[in-house]
C-alpha cells in the first residue's frame, strides 16, 4: 500500500493507493497519535509526508518516510486532479483555503507562492463560535447555509435605492455594514454565520483575482479543506470570481492535493 499524508494545523489529510484504487480520508490533527498508531500497524510500501506536522509523525513511526515542502506537494496534487477532472489549463492562480489561505501561481511547470491571508477555515470556526457558540464545523456550516446576509451586510443596491448603481448591486459595500440600520431586527445565528462566511469568501476571492490580474491569467483554482461541507463558501467564491470577470474552478477532493502530490513527488 502507498500512503501520502498532509499533516496540517487542523486536519490530517490521507491518500491511500492500493490495487489501482485511491482512497481519501481525514483525521483531526488533535488525533495525530491515532494516525501514528495506525501507520505503525500497517504494511506500507511507500510513505510520503508533507505539512506542518509531518515531522511529528516521522519521529514516531517505524517507517522511513520522505518529507516534501507542502507548497510543492499541493501544486503536484492539483496538477493530477485537474487532469483527472478534465480541466486543461496551462497557467493559473490557485488558492489553498485551509486554516488560513495561501496563494500560488503555476506557470505550466513550477509553482511559486505569491501571497497569503489569515482568512480561512480558522476564521470561520473561531468567529463562527463567537457569533453562535457552535464549535462543530459541520453544524456551523449547515446553519449558515440557511442564512440571509441582506440584513447584516450593506450591499451596493442598499445605497443606490432608487437609481441604477455604477457597479453591480449585489456587490458588498461593507461587510456587517447594515447592522446599525436594522437594530430593531433579531439577528439570527444563521444570518450572522452566513455573513461571516461571506467575509472569508470575499477576502479570499479579492486577493485571488488581484493576483490573477497581476500574473495575466483568467483562471483561478480553489482548493482546501475549508470547502468541506461548505456549499455557501463555494458559492460566494465562485459567484464573486465570475462577477469580477474571471473563471473559477472548484476541484473535487482538492483538499487532498498536498497528500496526493506528496505521493507522486
Swiss-Prot record:
Pathway: Cofactor biosynthesis; coenzyme A biosynthesis; CoA from (R)-pantothenate: step 1/5. ATP binds at residues 6-13, 99, 121-125, 137, 225. InterPro entries: ATPase_NBD (IPR043129), Type_II_PanK (IPR004567), Type_II_PanK_bac (IPR011602). It is an enzyme of class 2 (transferase). One of its GO terms (cellular component) is cytosol. The keyword Nucleotide-binding applies. It is found in: Cytoplasm. Belongs to the type II pantothenate kinase family. This is Type II pantothenate kinase. It comes from Staphylococcus epidermidis (strain ATCC 12228 / FDA PCI 1200). The gene is coaW.
